[in-house]
A protein has these predicted regions:
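Catalytic/RNA-binding core of pseudouridine synthases
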Residues: 4-166
Length: 166
């Protein structure tokens, strides 16, 4: 895909595979920063997870993470957050069309999320932990598809080189 063509996909639906680590939080909502709080997970079970997921389907108000590229007075939010400055971002409307629990083991959930442009999966992980009366952060993230383009149809660099130079 050419750079120019990539812009037309930005507004399209995206699908992600993610792993949330339950029982802890980080300031960045992912593994980029150290754990800042530990929570009990003894009350969390598969049924509770399934009930919690229902709260994340449809239109939602989401507050982006402080560690994001959103600009505040000309500076990236993450630059301010890394300096320890207090960052306050406004909530945004997002839409989650699917949230599928794939696996639950060792206080980690693997899930598949289909969502709108502007959705921060890190914020979903953090909010998910709050809904469980625990904590959570994003441990792993893979964008599976955007619009009709998916990883299954993507070329590896090796395959692309062979196509171009053979």
């Amino acid at each position: 895909m050419c750079i120019r063509d990539s812009y037309k996909y930005q507004n399209q639906k995206k699908t992600y595979y993610a792993t949330f680590k339950l029982g802890a939080t980080t300031p960045s909502y992912d593994r980029e920063t150290e754990i800042n709080e530990i929570f009990s997970t003894s009350h969390i079970n598969i049924n509770r997870l399934k009930i919690c997921i229902k709260n994340f389907i449809g239109e939602l108000d989401q507050i982006p993470p402080a560690f994001s590229a959103i600009k505040i007075n000309g500076k990236r939010s993450y630059e301010l957050a890394r300096k320890g400055e207090n960052v306050s971002l406004n909530s945004r409307k997002i839409f989650i069309s699917k949230f599928e629990l794939l696996n639950f083991k060792n206080c980690e959930i693997d899930c598949k999320i289909e969502c709108s442009k502007g959705t921060y999966i890190r914020s979903i992980a953090n909010d998910f932990g709050k809904h469980l009366n625990s904590g959570a952060y994003l441990k792993y993230l893979e964008r599976y598809s955007i619009g009709r383009l998916s990883i299954e149809n993507a070329y590896s660099l090796d395959k692309l080189e062979k196509q171009l130079f053979s």
